[in-house]
UniProtKB/Swiss-Prot annotation:
Protein name, as recorded: Aspartyl/glutamyl-tRNA(Asn/Gln) amidotransferase subunit C
A biological-process GO annotation: glutaminyl-tRNAGln biosynthesis via transamidation
InterPro entries (alphabetical): Asp/Glu-ADT_sf_sub_c, GatC
Function (record text): Allows the formation of correctly charged Asn-tRNA(Asn) or Gln-tRNA(Gln) through the transamidation of misacylated Asp-tRNA(Asn) or Glu-tRNA(Gln) in organisms which lack either or both of asparaginyl-tRNA or glutaminyl-tRNA synthetases. The reaction takes place in the presence of glutamine and ATP through an activated phospho-Asp-tRNA(Asn) or phospho-Glu-tRNA(Gln).
Catalytic activity: L-glutamyl-tRNA(Gln) + L-glutamine + ATP + H2O = L-glutaminyl-tRNA(Gln) + L-glutamate + ADP + phosphate + H(+); L-aspartyl-tRNA(Asn) + L-glutamine + ATP + H2O = L-asparaginyl-tRNA(Asn) + L-glutamate + ADP + phosphate + 2 H(+)
HAMAP family listed in its UniProt record: GatC (MF_00122)
Any one Gene Ontology molecular-function term assigned to this protein's record: ATP binding
Record's keyword terms, sorted: ATP-binding, Ligase, Nucleotide-binding, Protein biosynthesis
Xref: NCBIfam families: gatC
Family: Belongs to the GatC family.
Recorded name of the encoding gene: gatC
Gene3D superfamilies xrefs: Glu-tRNAGln amidotransferase C subunit, N-terminal domain (1.10.20.60)
Amino acid sequence: MLNEEQVKKVAHLARLELSGEEVAQFTTQLGSILDYFQQLEELNVTDVPPTTRAIESSNITRADQLHPWAERENILAIAPEQDGDFFRVPKIISTED
């Protein structure tokens, strides 16, 4: 069973700040989800072929196309900070655990 310390650790790794009420709520909810996965592990699927989808589908994506954008320089000009052709943004992820 999942405990509150595990939920706090996952929240910390995901850079989420949870209140005590949210920790309790997510402990219950995530515990239910993990219990469901435990039930799925008990199913006999030896004769079921591996699949990635329940319904077969063909490739529905399109090829990427590069188009020049006339407003590019205008957008870069109003950026608070830029570095050449890139926006400069504050660092938000640290390497601390």
